[in-house]
Structure formats: structure tokens, C-alpha cells
Amino acid sequence: MSVEQKYIRNFCIIAHIDHGKSTLADRLLEYTGALSKREMVDQVLDTMDLERERGITIKLQAVRLHYKARDGQEYVLNLIDTPGHVDFTYEVSRSLAACEGALLVVDAAQGIEAQTLANVYLALEHNLEIIPVINKIDLPSAEPERVRREIEDVIGLDASEAILASAKTGVGTEEILEAIIRRVPPPRGDGEAPLQALIFDSIFDSYRGAIPYFRVVQGRVRKGDRIRFMATGAEFEVNEVGVFTPAPRPVESLAAGEVGFLSASIKNVKDTRVGDTITSAERPAPAPLPGYRKVMPMVYCGLFPVESERYDDLRDALEKLQLNDASLTFETETSVALGFGFRCGFLGLLHMEIIQERLEREYGLELITTAPSVVYRVVGTNGSVIMVDNPTALPAPNLIDHIEEPFVEATIMTPKDFVGPVMELCQEKRGSFLNMDYLSEKRVALKYDLPLAEIIYDFFDQLKSRTRGYASLDYSLKGYRPSELVKMDILVNNEVVDALSLITHRDQAYQRGRALVERLRQLIPRQLFDVPIQAAIGSRVIARETIPALRKNVLAKCYGGDVTRKRKLLEKQKEGKKRMKQVGTVDIPQEAFMAVLKAGKS
């Protein structure tokens, strides 16, 4: 039995990290009785341990709540939880496409942050009704009136009806639910039209295969229907249709406006593409739903198993993660130093760290990662254009006319005391200043054009340390621009180690090369012969360190005696070392590859 459309409300919660979004979701679940007190844990919707530990939401969750409103009517509210981090903007846009309204949660002490803004603009693009909620009013440092003014001045929303709440104590929960019913429009859509459903997420279950989460836009879907995925053309028979209350519960059918999941023994993860449209195989919809794009990775790095025989396990693990995470891409890669592995593409650095951690935790893999790199556009002397995401794939310098790198427009919000250090950091990172806005007497928004390569290197860490953790950052891709870029190779014992190569700006090559060789000198164990470590651009060495040889004390047996006797023994040792150097090889320990990532940060 499906619910009448006028009693359905689909909404999501948008907020900056740590403004209390997951806790507010907990209160809504508790208030509507979706979970008993016994089942309640903090941050119910953050199902991964990793999400709880880092205090961030990565995967989307969709929950159906039943709420009896003050008008005596029972409503069905579908809460679609969204991640707030800049790397996951695409996931946010998918959730927003499945809703009609959004709760904008702002911390009463901190005010508006960069990512709040970015997500609000996305919500406005999707024409959502936005309900401002000022959270954490129980804090001694809360200033709800200042935040209310900020919402009006910065975003331009009418905040006179903003709801004051405290997700921790549960104040304002009922007002929020009433506001959703009063202000969010019910879904529109014809239950009898051909089926059109938007996939906004999918998970992989080892028993039931790939399970898409979707919002029905037109028509209805029942158990036993034959469905087709419009992007891939694959067809399946539906075994089960259900909703989350947060635990999965089967239902007869889902009609236009409702949110739920289906299982259809879908073996291949690639069939349930996020953003694809599900339609009926017998009576297909004329066109797929709009607003869907294939998501492009921004950051690439190599992942190699420490034990090369676990290569197949790594591939299986990546395929399973890719199911849950449409934005992860990978292809095989071989490296002279590291053997077989994968070149993986991510949305950003946080996304990269999370995937690595999940591979290590959930699949028990030990990994070596190479330094992250962005996608460069290389224009050849013959006019050809190639995209390079791996420094080893860069053509020879005489074949390159110029190299272009991706630039982003970054918005940095910071307390006004830190404007100086932030501007200094942006200058160091080759940024160009665009403009500066005072949001209130204490807070400033700075806009800069910055190369993406600098942001993925260590920009975020530096920004946090220079502003004592107060600044927040959001960025969007602007396009490509020519830059003075060079490829820097690292040679150990006169042999290039391909996994340590990187593309860097000419002005920073020396500092980066110097930092790297010094770091490697500390990490590579001493051999029985001298080992030179060099950083080189082309054939020109720009920095060098030498690891001195381990030497046996050959003079231990000589007590006194003539100096020529000692000299003879030392010369003989030296000769042996020389021969050894010609045939010796140096094993580079795993820590050395990790060092490349940290070389710029120390």
C-alpha cells in the first residue's frame, strides 16, 4: 500500500562538518519513534566505523520516518542524509536531486562556513525549499542573533523564521518537523505514468548483489516487475522492494514521490550507476531524468600491495568499493620499483585517505601509495593534446610545447585576525587574489585562484595550522591554464626510481628536491658501499645526498707497524667497495615511498 503524495515530504540536511547534522538526524529518528531508546546509538546514520571516528558522513543514508503532525494527520518523511565535505559535492548533488526541501543547519557559535555556502548554492540550483536551523543554542558561546543576520546577509535567505534548536538536548525538534510539513512541498509525479526512478546511491550485499537506493519520480515499481537501467541498458527482475526505517523493511510497491531500495540479483556493480534512471522494461519512459553526469576524479595516485601475491585481492576489494562509490576509478599500473598495482582516481585528498583506510581495514590489505598527482594537459610540439595523470607518462621534454594544469577558485572563510597568514599561504602556493568580503565584523571570506596541485599537496594542513583550525575551505574547478611545470626524477644509486617521480613547478623544484633527498637519506638503510641519492630535472641534478658506506675495521689486526701496511689494507678495502658498487643493488624500504608524501609537510 503506497502513501498518498500529499502526505509525503522528502528532505535532506545540509551543513558544514561538525555543525551537528548527524546528531540532529538522531533526534529526528528518536522523536518520530523510528528507533527505540535501546537501539539508539550516537550518529545512527553514520554506519561506517570510519565515519564515527572522523566525525564525518561519507556514505548517504535514506530513512523513512512516520510523524503524526499537530493537524492530527500522519505524514511520511523521507530523510536523505548528505555528506558535508568538499570532496563529496557530487554525492550531495545526487541527494538534493531526490528531495523537495532542505534543512540548512548552522552552528550558533561558528556561523556560516565555506561548505555550508557551497551546499546552499547547490540546493538553490535544484529549487529546494530551504529551512534555516540554528543549532547548538545550548552552548555558552552561542550567538543566534548574529548567525541569523549572517544567514540573511551572506546567503540572502529570510531568517526571520529560522528555528533555534539544540540537537544535543533535543530542543526545537518538534518545530523542525512541523516546519518540514508546513514549508516543504509534497512531491509531484504521476503514479500511472511509465516508471522513472533516480538512483542516488547503491550498496553491495554479498547475498543479494548490488542494491540501488532510488527516488521514484514517475510511475510505480513492484516486486516481480522487469526493470531496465537506462544508462547501461541492463534488464533485471525485481525480487524485493523496500524502505529503510533505518533497518530495511520490504513493502508491496513504491509509487511516485517515495524513496526506497530494490534488489534484483544484480551481479555487476557497474549496472547500478549513481544518477542513472530506472524504468520499466515492458513500458519504458521516453527519456532518462536530467542533471546527471559522470563524475570526474580530480586526484590520482598509485596503490600497490606490499606483498605482490595479494594483487588479485586488491583488485577484488577495489571492485567492491567502487560499487558503493561511483566516483572511484582505477586501472592497472606497473612500476619497476613496486611491481603490479593500480592507478586510482579520487575526488580529493579526504576521499583518497578514506578509500585507503577502508582497503586496509575492511579487506586487511597492506598498501604502498605513491604521491598524489592531478591530471595535466600536455600540448605537444605537433599540436596534439594528451591528458597525463602519472608523472612517468610524461613525454620527453623536446616533444612538449607547454603543460597546462587545473586551477580552482577557492573560497576561504577565516576570522579577521588570520587574514594576513592566509594571504601569505595563498601567495606561497602560487595563488592569485580575486576578492575579499567582510561577512561580519569578525569574519572574512577570501577568494583566490589556486593550482589544484598545490591544494592536494598540503594546503589544507597548512591552512588549519596557520589559522589555529578556524578557517574553512571550499573550492570548485575553474579550468586549465599553462604553467612552468617540470618533471623531477629521483635517482638512487644512479638509477631512476619511477615511483618517486613527480611533476612540480619550476620555482619550487629545488626546495622539493632538497626536502625529498634529505628525507630519503634518513630512510634508506646504509649499504656496504656509498649510495648517492639525487633529484634531477632531465639530465641536470639539482640536489644530492650520499649515504656513507658501512665499513669493517680492517686495521684492527695491525698493532703499530709501518703506515704503508695500513695503507695497503685500506686501499684493498676501497677497491673491493668499488667493485661492489658496480654490481650492488639498493632495496628501497616501504617507508621511503611514504616519505614522499610527507616531504613537503615537514
UniProtKB/Swiss-Prot annotation:
GO terms for biological process: positive regulation of translation. The keyword Cell membrane applies. GTP binds at D18, H19, G20, K21, S22, T23, N135, K136, I137, D138. The keyword Protein biosynthesis applies. GO terms for molecular function: GTP binding; GTPase activity; ribosome binding; translation elongation factor activity. It holds the Pfam family GTP_EFTU_D2. Keywords: Cell membrane, GTP-binding, Hydrolase, Membrane, Nucleotide-binding, Protein biosynthesis. It comes from the Bacteria. Its main location: membrane. Its EC number is 3.6.5.n1. Coiled coil: none annotated. GO terms for cellular component: plasma membrane. It is found in: Cell membrane. PANTHER family: TRANSLATION FACTOR GUF1 HOMOLOG, CHLOROPLASTIC, TRANSLATION FACTOR GUF1-RELATED. Required for accurate and efficient protein synthesis under certain stress conditions. May act as a fidelity factor of the translation reaction, by catalyzing a one-codon backward translocation of tRNAs on improperly translocated ribosomes. Back-translocation proceeds from a post-translocation (POST) complex to a pre-translocation (PRE) complex, thus giving elongation factor G a second chance to translocate the tRNAs correctly. Binds to ribosomes in a GTP-dependent manner. This is Elongation factor 4. It comes from Moorella thermoacetica (strain ATCC 39073 / JCM 9320).
